[in-house]
Amino acid sequence: MNKIAHDDFKKADAELNKVYKKVIEVLDVTEKQLMIKAQKDWLKFRDSHCKFEIEQFKGGSISPLIYSTCLSERTNVRIEDLKSILEDKNR
């Protein structure tokens, strides 16, 4: 189960990078700078949030599963946010 959850996260992360690059391509210089900062901040938030989520399971065998699942969930939400930005820019 841990491997499946980790693999799911890796797939989501690859999709995130793909969509992020598409968004960056359609932004002007100022928007690009802001998006780069926003994405870096979001990555820090995602990782911190998921570390918080597993704190109650610290040391337990379920921790890796909870952590990977959290990363996947947060990443999938971000993908949808970025797709929305991309759609707005392509109108």
Regions inferred by a protein language model and the residue ranges of each:
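N-terminal alpha-helical modules
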Residues: 1-91
